[in-house]
């Protein structure tokens, strides 16, 4: 990437209906002792080709929210809509990539792993599924490993297979739950770069979960900041001006520090001051 990728923000979009709308969603789960609220009245919208990041500390409900968008958990309050239709169950229009890449069946080759959901869902016949699998393996740089087995791949290569498998289904939105968290720092940076290059070529819609401020600024063009448990919306900021080349720069570091203050400062006045210092035109604050 020779220049920052110019994503779009809410301020310059002209669509009337968002691709995904999360409207006042609260989520709960049960423990042996009690019912725990994971998120409280969270709202946001995602438009086509957005790289939207859910950012917050561990335990703030990011992953729970992602699973609810995928259709695995029903909100106890509010609703989630995809293209105006209420989300009530899982579907091939929302594909999830987790950080555990051992989700790849070890007895299937790389190509067979990518083909599997296409065949299982009867989306395509075998010949068409093979063609599409090879197409997306080429996109992620693994065409030469189509006949390899998962145990022969590195962690980064397994991540690429998981991404190729997800994109081969051509979902309306790709959901990624801290997909690079288990990788070493160098591989993680490489995967971030490859994800952005792939987005530049394919322009898929991405919802990305992370607890890393730096990763959020690099990957996203918009970031939703969630408070510590239970997750509430602290702010939404635009971040399309940053990319991997911004790491270590003064503006990048200052923005990361101010986002940290927004996430963790319980004083609403201090949080509002940090938001003002960010200088983004499309920032939204909620306390």
Where do the PLM segments sit?
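ABC-type ATPase nucleotide-binding domains, specifically the catalytic core motifs of the NBD
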Residues: 30-32, 74, 115-128, 139-140
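Helix-to-loop junction immediately C-terminal to a conserved catalytic motif
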Residues: 70
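Conserved ABC transporter NBD signature motif
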Residues: 78-90
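Short coil-to-helix segment of the ABC ATPase nucleotide-binding domain corresponding to the Q-loop/switch region
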Residues: 107-116
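Conserved ABC ATPase "signature" region
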Residues: 126-145, 197
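Conserved ABC ATPase signature
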Residues: 149-153, 157
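Conserved catalytic motifs of ABC-family nucleotide-binding domains
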Residues: 170
């Amino acid at each position: 990437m020779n220049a920052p990728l110019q994503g779009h923000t809410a301020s310059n979009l002209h669509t009337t209906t968002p691709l995904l709308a999360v409207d006042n969603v609260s989520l709960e789960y049960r423990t042996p002792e009690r019912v725990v609220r994971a998120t409280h009245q969270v709202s946001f919208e995602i438009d086509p080709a957005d790289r939207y990041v859910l950012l917050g500390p561990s335990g703030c409900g990011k992953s729970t929210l992602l699973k609810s968008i995928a259709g695995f958990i029903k909100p106890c309050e509010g609703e989630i809509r995809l293209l105006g239709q209420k989300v009530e169950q899982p579907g091939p229009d929302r594909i999830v990539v987790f950080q555990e890449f051992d989700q790849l069946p070890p007895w299937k080759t790389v190509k067979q792993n990518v083909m599997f959901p296409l065949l299982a869902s009867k989306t395509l016949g075998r010949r068409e599924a093979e063609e599409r699998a090879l197409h997306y393996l080429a996109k992620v740089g693994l065409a030469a490993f189509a006949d390899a087995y998962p145990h022969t791949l590195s962690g980064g290569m397994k991540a690429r297979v998981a991404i190729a498998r997800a994109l081969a289904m051509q979902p309306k939105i790709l959901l990624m739950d801290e997909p690079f968290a288990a990788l070493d720092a160098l591989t993680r940076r490489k995967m971030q770069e490859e994800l952005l290059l792939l987005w530049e070529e394919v322009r898929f819609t991405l919802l990305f979960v992370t607890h890393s401020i730096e990763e959020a600024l690099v990957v996203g063009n918009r970031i939703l900041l969630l408070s510590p448990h239970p997750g509430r919306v602290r702010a939404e900021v635009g971040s399309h001006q940053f990319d991997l080349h911004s790491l270590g720069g003064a503006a990048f570091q200052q923005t990361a520090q101010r986002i940290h203050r927004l996430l963790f400062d319980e004083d609403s006045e201090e949080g509002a001051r940090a938001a003002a210092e960010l200088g983004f035109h499309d920032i939204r604050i909620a306390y």
